Amino acid sequence: MDSNSPKSLYKFDVVHINIRGVLANNDNLAEYLQELNYPEIITLNETKLAPEKRVTVNNYECVSRRETHRSYGSMILVRSDIGNVVEINNIKTRFMNDEIIGIEILETALHPGLKVFTMYNPPNKVPNADIFRYISNLSGKVILSGDFNCKNLSWGSTKTDRLGEDLQDLINENDLYILNDSSKTRCDPFSGKEEALDLILCNHENLSLFRGFWVGPPIGSDHFPIHSRQQFRSDPNPTSREKERRIESTDWKKFEQILNSSTSLAAPKTPTEADLVAENLTREITKAFQDSCPLQYKRQPYRTAFTPEIKAMVKEKRKLRRLKNAAMERNDITHVRHIMTKINRLGNDIKGLQKLERKHQLEKHCEQLSREVNPKKFFQTFKKVANPIINSEPTPSSFQIISDEFGNEAKTDQEKSDLFANRLEKVHQEPSYRGFNAEWKKSVDDHTTNNPGTFLVDPHSEYAVPEDGDDSPLLGEVTTQEIRYNLAKCKTKSAVGLDGISYGLLKKLPETYLKKIAGFLTICLRLGHFPSSWKHAKTILIPKPGKDSKQAKNHRPISLLSCLGKILERILADRLSKHLEQNNLFAKSQSGFRAKRMTTEQLLRLSEECHNAFKTQKVTAALFLDAEAAFDKCWHNGIRYKLRKNLKLPNRFIRIISSFLTDRTLQVFYRGCWSRKVGLQAGTPQGSPLSPLIYLIFVNDLPQEIVDLGLSLSQYADDTALWTAAYTVAFGISKLQKGLNFLEGWCRRWRVKLNGDKSKLLIISRLREKTSETPCLQLFDDIIKPVPTARFLGVEFDSRLNFAPHIQDINGRANKRLNVLRVLSRGGATPSTLTKLYGMYIRPLFEYGSAAFLAAPKNQLEKIQKTQNEAIRVSLRLPSYIRINLMHEAASMPKLQDRLTDLNKKLLLTIKQNNEHIEHLASDRSANSISPNIISPLDILL
């Protein structure tokens, strides 16, 4: 587009408002911004917002805010569609005693760059000269807005005071310019006297862009909003509303006809040909979906609908505002006051009707819940009410600067995308540590290099020569039934990979086309090759709750892989898991990702052994280990070595697993920006169904000497725990150290780095042992000291084993969820609906891991029983004087202790069949007991 064309002129508005309480005037602010067609930047003074409070304004994000005094407060809002905006953080520390904040819009092809500041200068205070010198020394275009509380005839005040003279001098000395046009910016509500106190200033570089200034009507404050308009020569190319294809709108008959009429695929003979066939399959399915499903506009986020009556009142309110503006231009103060009275009354009426409408919506949801029979739809309806109440975690601003551990910073969305990608590339590198065994690494690498036919396949080699193990069930023909079985375990609406093919689409494939896919997957198995296009991931980043989202490490990467590729991964994982189980190749200590194995058995085992130690007046020393980036840093050659040496799998199956790990890539997608493609040299792919099983194989051969020492070993995926019972703490620690030395040797060989800072040592004892100093453990170069509590598989164990910290935690979370029941109860939900919600939404918090704390002190279990009592009262709307037994009878609900006991008795039957440790504890639980008064979980369950 020609830069001189009128179409290339792009307006950019900055609006400053002294809001006098942003929460109180939030609705008025939203209406006003809508009337203005959503200006780009809003600066606010006197927000009067407590630091812990948050405020949301539709279509805007809060980039910067500050509260130095409860009566002050400043905030800058930026329209959500404006990218490349960062907060200027150093100004808060530079001027700690002043109310000033700032943001920067970075220079792009669409915007010349702009720095915007707002400050609030309290009455009778001389403006800080250092602020103006700082603003003057900045490069680029700068705007400073604020309520300066200074009067000067030069900007429209009725008089000039001492503060106004000082401010005028500062403006002149620092080459700043006033954009105001002498309009009054405040009207005293009592005397009607008008003054000009709010200003918008700019530097010389920005003056050439200035196109206009005007004053708007007050919105809940005695100050008038002031507007400044700049104009740039660029084309912002605003994005139109996006379109999408919805799977439920697909013409499935047409979809099947297109796929059935597709040409048959030539059977690939080499890995290179297999890659081409995989890409062709993706193209055919994608084109069939596009031709049979129309494009539709993306659905807008759910909003509470306004009634026609409310819309008419909002329209009338806007009309009154226009009349008030006209009266202000005529200086008709009496008429202005009369209209303002009408506006305020109408605003209160609108708020009242909105409140009634929200109540009506709640009643509608409650009625829908009472009628809904389908559990899935029941929970979807419930989440519409629950999510706004429970999810209080603030959404990170898109404008914040993100930094990584290496000191790199990213401001724009593209920079952030590349920053995340670079970090993931560094994480997925072959682990190196000065203590690792270099000779063993060379031996394993040489073994892999000297046996290329076992681990790798030539891209151009044909499958012709039979090999040992070709008749193994692992390499059997893939059937359509096997594909359907694995598809049935997948969520229909699961996120899709780069190819855009979902599980829902694959479930609708016709049988003839499914046979084509089954034949291709069989050939991949025989070739020992995993198609390259299925090894490329789209990675998105989700901030970890409760962590600082400005740190790149506090974002969790979610890899979206091809659903077609994940079907092959599921088939490989299913076959390999059955092979390992049938041949008893899993270590007895491993419970993670195995059929009929669960976290409960490991929690019960630890709790039971600790209670048995109490009975014999022993202490338990437990070590909970944390492997650094466990899944992300698995040594690939180490995995290949173990597949061949430890499991003796067929060569072709080893090759396809090796191919699955080799040459994997990802691209980070962050707020519409793609990073460069990065390679992953180590680790298992996140989000893959096969990755957990590969990790289990990698850690399946922990040293047997650990168990021979008399230590108990528990593995659940990457959660590893060691513990032992002893008569003294020192002896228990010494046994743990010996076992840890064996484990450390294994880690040095297999290049696993244990994190000493995150590993926890817990001494569990009810004895009053007098020791001058508790011994510590040494792990590599780290010293591990005892801690009062440690979390294991989601349950908080403490040194006295009374589970007070854990019960306090789950009780706190349950009480938050109980608020949802209270809201629904007020909305008219039926008692049966509320009790049903308690059973599916709150009680599971108490049930998980309950086998471990079943023998907790009575006063601790009573705490969660009280929460259940309150839930029943809320559900049945019962007064506080009704007896607890009668309440439970009315709700047809057992006491929580009885419920947990019955539940764990059923679990114990399954556990005893699969875990010999629990079976042994059950048979010998009373042997050598010195303290028979101590009750263990198995004493309650058996």
Model regions and ranges:
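Conserved, non-catalytic sequence blocks in retroelement Pol enzymes and Pol-derived host proteins
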Residues: 67, 154-164, 186-192, 218-220, ...
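Active-site palm subdomain of RNA-directed nucleic acid polymerases
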Residues: 132-145, 572-590, 615, 692-727
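Basic/polar low-complexity segments
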Residues: 174, 196-197, 204, 229-235, ...
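Catalytic palm active-site di-aspartate
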Residues: 146-149, 223, 497, 536-539, ...
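Short amphipathic alpha-helical interface segments
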Residues: 277-280, 436, 500-501, 535-538, ...
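Conserved pre-catalytic core of RNA-dependent polymerases
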Residues: 424, 469-685, 724
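Non-catalytic, peripheral interaction segments enriched in hydrophobic/basic residues
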Residues: 297-298, 303-306, 587, 716-717, ...
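A shared catalytic/ligand-binding motif for oxyanion handling
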Residues: 1-352, 565, 707, 712, ...
